[in-house]
Amino acid sequence: MGFASLLPLPAGADPLDDAFAQLAEPSGEGWRIAESDILRDWSRSGSAAMDLLLQRGEAALDRGDLPTAIGHLSALTDHAPDFAAGFQARAAALAMSGQFGPALSDLQRTLVLEPRHFAALTQLGAMLEEMGDPDRALDAYRASLAIHPHQQEAIDAVARLERQRLGTDI
């Protein structure tokens, strides 16, 4: 640990700024560590109880138990309304259950709380694409890639939508 990490941050500085700068680097492998650091930070609410609700909601989502996932994640967003990860996770569960309106609202809230939430932007792109809005989906994917240019899902989606736009989709 260097001495710089022991110094207080200037007022208004985000401790993730360095990680986001590393994430945006076009070459090298440092972005993988930065991505991991960012995702780990985003998954911490500051409350063990809220973190447990997130874990339970995500586990239910992984099992495909959407009602349970939505229940846990709704409890989380009710009790931790400033925790972006709760809204982003609930948006995934809502979208998987076909509730696109509420899912879009949750993604909007996620992005208000954390404008650099590249996962939410990629999720938004996928949802807009599924809803038949390829132009806005492309905008969301591109916004996500401006923050995190190494996301294969977003890279592939941009290429696919650009091919479709040009009429060369195969």
Model-predicted segments: where are they?
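Canonical positions in the second alpha-helix
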Residues: 41, 75-76, 109-110, 143-144
